[in-house]
Amino acid sequence: MSHQPILCLLLTAVTVLSSCLDEQDFHSPEQPETPSVPTVPEGNYFADSLEYTPEKQRQTLTDIQRGYFRFFYENCQADSKMALIGTERSINTVALAGSAYAATAIPVAVERGWITRKEGAQRFLDMCTFLNKAERYHGAWSHWMDGKTGTGLPFNQKQQSAGDLVETSFMMMGLFICSEYFNSEDATETEARAFVSKFHNEIDWNFYTNGEKTLYWAWDKDLGFAPLKITGPCEALPAYLLALSAPEEYAVTEDVYTNGWRGNKFFNAGRTTYGYTFELGGEEKGGPLFTTQHPFLWINPFLYQDNYADYWEFCTNHALINRHYSLNDAPKEYLYDEYNWGLSACYGPEPLGYKGRAPGESRDDGTICTTGAMGTIPVTPFYALQVIRSLYETPHLQGTYGIADAYNRSLAWADSRYLSISVMPVVSVI
């Protein structure tokens, strides 16, 4: 493979423009707060009416998309203009992956007329300016950072002050999207693009092999490499693609992709689950839905090919398997149905908490990630829209920025929080 820079494929920045180009702009300093969770009769958690005209459906998608963009644009960290981890979290801790998805959404907002091109370019530059001063670890940024100083913050016991290669790859993908979109000779756009080129030339992907034929997820300046190799299939595909296409000094060789991405349980020839071809990975029913959603914000699975997989089929069947399990195999007390499914990473009622949910007794506790099924709209649009319409009409899930993170029907629990890593990808996939 050549080490030429990858031209990222933005799937959806300009695909849904018909309904909102004449909408009134919002500007964060003046935008009034949307009322918080409304008061509704006890027990009225779920949608009663699902009658939708095409116009109402279009408006529903627009409202969801715009509300989630407002979460980033109005609720960013004040100094860095990067995305916060989420609501009810530190107002100074920024999330690298959340910021990557937010950067990807900026061109969408410009095309939809929610912000001007000038405002979008300025936010792009503000984020780049912060990233340029932020602490780096052989070119990679930290999973979480102090938005005031740029210092890397602890994420887990193995990542106290560490570069996170996967989330760095996400951030670069988002910046590449902005670079492709903000391509004029305007001074702001030119300066921002120069930062992105600089970052591209500084990330030492080869260092993160640790001398092996694989990539490692993270490296801590005091603790060394975290014991976590990046093997597919998972959300980390962009890390391998950018490592292959990096400048020669820092690029990895093709055998790192072949041996690292494939891993030991990558290909299972002939395997089917519920009648769907599902030959990739060690999980017969698939992991959390985000693992086949987030990387394909930037990589078109219909076009991307390697020697091992049909990634469009893989993404589509992952969604169909998740839905089939929920409707047919999950415990009946979880009350899943065609309007209530979508197992992915999300908050949960205490003591269940946040975790990556997926089909199977050990990974499913009845908690539905609202953006799980939403994120399947490119591959299973009819099934996704069934869920989206229901969520939109569920009062207890509505908050300042629209549909909140998660709910559990069997426990009559509905969350009121938002996570940047959950909501920001939806802006682009819609």
Description of each model-found segment:
Residues M1-S18:
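Sec-dependent bacterial lipoprotein signal peptides
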Residues V37-I430:
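Ser/Thr/Asn(+Pro)-rich, low-complexity disordered segments
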Residues T15-L50:
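Bacterial Sec-dependent N-terminal signal peptides
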